[in-house]
Amino acid sequence: MRILVAMSGGVDSSVVAGLLKSQGHDVIGVTMKLWEGPNGEMPETGCCTAADSEDARKVAAKLDIPYYVLDYTASFSENVIDNFVDMYSQGLTPNPCVECNRSVKFDHFIDQAKKLNCEKVATGHYAKIVRSNDSLELHKADYLEKDQSYVLHMLTADKLPKIDFPLGTISKPEVRQIAASLGLKTAFKKDSQDICFVGKKDYRNFVSSRIDFSSSGDIVDKDDNIIGTHEGVHEFTVGQRKGIPGGQGQPKYVTKIDVENNKVFIGSKADLTTKNFIIEDVSFVNGEEYENLSIQTRYNSHDIPCKLHKGKSESALQRRSFSTKKERSLLARKESSFYSGKERFFPIKKSAHFFKKRALF
């Protein structure tokens, strides 16, 4: 089988290419150029750097497979960077990696695979695609410590047959051992933790450089008493504790961001919790609505048991209500994933614009 391998220059995608080649597949390596400096150069820090591209090229040469770097900077800028800035300007917390998977990577990789006569696209994500009866489901990886199903929740049923996750049953230590046995230079390369277009810089400076947040505003408590000032709502996210004025020795958190009135509300941790929530833009991958679920609101966080209340969606936003047994703090994040069953298989794709953390009743 001819397979396009999405190569990031890291150990995971390197091993995917190596494993598929050793299994007799016709492998083609492709790296996306997503972000560039003012002179068209690839960034030096973060992920998707010039060094990463060079590492991917050397791995491809070691494995003796064709390798290409394709330029998708325009698509990335429009769909990911603009979205990143827009979300912060609305007082919401974006997830650029999820947005990149949704709007850029998988669509373009699948399209490129078709052009190269490849039957599948393989990536180094830790997740599994499992057949159940006549449909495919997205499951968590066996190695839960690195499970990445959360950042893949946007994958729709029509895309799953075109994708392969060879690392779904392999642990990270095993991946590094395989890389070393294949003589790949990425065997002990550290995983990137940075936002590719921000790197090690403060995201606030990046956002403020792209939109005018020059007007200062007030930091207030839940009774609207002024307790401080801020230089722009983009510097805050709901649930944030660092840099928040305290009081009476108790930590304070951002509980609400009022963009229209340029106010940042702060309160106690208890002010962030509720049992009832509204979620928007819910779609069910296999068309079946599950009731007893668990929800994950950020990468590598614990699942929270919840109940999805069935009923007709409100308007075109596909709005649904759900609740938890105990009061929880589910913040105003852009992305969340639902899971169902003992194996935590992935019945629902959520591409929500935001959580609305408010009581339903």
Predicted feature locations:
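AMP-forming adenylation/ATP pyrophosphatase catalytic core
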Residues: 122-130, 134-349, 353-355, 360
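ATP-dependent adenylation/nucleotidyltransferase module used to activate substrates
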Residues: 1-153, 180, 254, 344, ...
